[in-house]
Amino acid sequence: MEDSEKKLNQKSDDKPRKVRFKISSSYSGRVLKQVFEDGQELESPKEEYPHSFLQEALEPMDGVYGSGEVPKPQPYSPKLTAQRISVFRDSGAYTLAGSQPLFNDYKANDHKPPPIIDFGKIIIYTNNLKIIRTPMDKRDFMRKILQKEDVAEEASLMITGENDGDREQGCPLPERNGSPLPESERTFLHSQHTQDGLVPEDCLHCQGSGIATCSLCHGSKFSMLANRFKESYRALRCPACNENGLQPCRICSP
């Protein structure tokens, strides 16, 4: 019976098995995992990749021993007998998967079997992660808009109060040789002073506040240069306005 089983095993070994998929390291070329078409897995095959075969025989795992076998005392932590250990580095401290310390819980008489590790997952490690600011919800957006309107209204009220005080004191009309100027010349002077930023209280764009909604982002504060589908992040916030989405008036500001 043993001879027939050996012959069958030799015949099965002679037939090349088709590999379903294989995972290898792009840095060293070492084969990490190999699964054949029949579903069997082969970790670090010795026949094809002898340099990547680390152990000739693995120790009994999960505390399973034969009838006459006795577990041998281990001089080191049983966690190191696992086939695969995920080590994470965080500010100089090395921890295992599950936030367990590596050697802090080591004891000389610790002979517990190693924990069961989940081998049914493929984990991809990358260092090309970027954090993108989450968009505001509707309530936050409306709250910010109301805050902007309150700021603009307060500024306009302050400027209007100052102008009312000046009018109460009596601002003389422009005159020439002791007589008031005609309406056409007064309109021309008004437009000229408006361009120079001397009379912002009569500006139709900002209504005398001196500040207006941003013409680029229209108060949303999102930059048009931030392309979220490519690696071309130049600015996440609009560079033309302040934190409230406002900018100086283009008509009456100097």
UniProtKB/Swiss-Prot annotation:
Compartment annotation: Cell projection, Stereocilium
Biased composition (Basic and acidic residues): 1-16
Disruption phenotype: Mice appear normal at postnatal week 2, but develop progressive hearing loss associated with early defects in orientation and organization of cochlear stereocilia bundles. They have normal vestibular function. Reducing Tprn expression corrects stereocilium morphological defects and partially restores hearing in Grxcr2 mutant mice.
Tissues in which the UniProt entry reports expression: Expressed in sensory hair cells in the cochlea and vestibular organ.
GO cellular component, one term: cytosol
Region of interest called Disordered, as start-end residue ranges on this chain: 1-20, 161-183
Keywords from the UniProt entry: Cell projection, Hearing
Principal cellular location given in the protein's record: other
Pfam families referenced in this protein's UniProt entry, alphabetically: GRXCR1-2_C
Family label: Belongs to the GRXCR2 family.
Subunit organization: Interacts with TPRN; the interaction restricts TPRN to the stereocilum basal region.
Protein's name according to its UniProt entry: Glutaredoxin domain-containing cysteine-rich protein 2
